[in-house]
Every structure is written in C-alpha cells, then in structure tokens.
C-alpha cells in the first residue's frame, strides 16, 4: 500500500 501507498499513501498520498
């Protein structure tokens, strides 16, 4: 997962 990536975060903005």
Swiss-Prot record:
Keywords: D-amino acid, Hormone. GO terms for molecular function: hormone activity. The modification D-phenylalanine is found at residue 2. Neuroexcitatory peptide; increases the impulse frequency and produces a spike broadening of the identified heart excitatory neuron (PON); also enhances the amplitude and frequency of the heart beat. Has also an effect on several other muscles. This is Achatin-1. It comes from Lissachatina fulica. The lineage of its organism: Eukaryota, Metazoa, Spiralia, Lophotrochozoa, Mollusca.
């Amino acid at each position: 997962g990536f975060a903005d």
